[in-house]
């Protein structure tokens, strides 16, 4: 196994996250369920990893015909939200069927939307 070094930065606010991520070779991390695996497999070798968990993007806003979800909301939290369960039950069902409880507890909604490469074999092949 080849070991390589990288810089880890914990961003406390959005300007700090943007500044840390502006350097070449930086990757943002929230749940890390994809990035950590890609780093282990040496598919990704970022020079800097920027932890964005301190940023305030964890809101879930349920309206009669709309759902707004912050990028840092965990899959578990979205699936368990009473408003989502009532108004958008198919989202709850999809989230609960999509991964193990351990992954759902770590994985962020934003990270799942922005996976590189996608984990879903369908999207990898299309």
Locations of the language-model features?
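C-terminal structural segment of proteins
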Residues: 1-126
């Amino acid at each position: 196994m080849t070991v390589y070094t990288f810089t880890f930065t914990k961003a406390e606010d959005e300007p700090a996250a943007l500044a840390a991520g502006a350097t070449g070779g930086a990757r943002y991390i929230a749940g890390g369920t994809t990035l950590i695996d890609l780093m282990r497999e040496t598919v990704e070798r970022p020079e800097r990893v920027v932890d964005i968990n301190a940023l305030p993007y964890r809101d879930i806003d349920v309206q009669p015909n709309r759902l707004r979800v912050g990028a840092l909301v965990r899959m578990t939290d979205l699936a368990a939200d009473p408003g989502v369960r009532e108004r958008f039950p198919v989202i709850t069902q999809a989230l609960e069927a999509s991964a193990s409880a351990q992954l759902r507890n770590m994985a962020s909604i934003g990270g799942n939307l922005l996976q590189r490469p996608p984990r879903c074999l369908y999207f990898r092949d299309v």
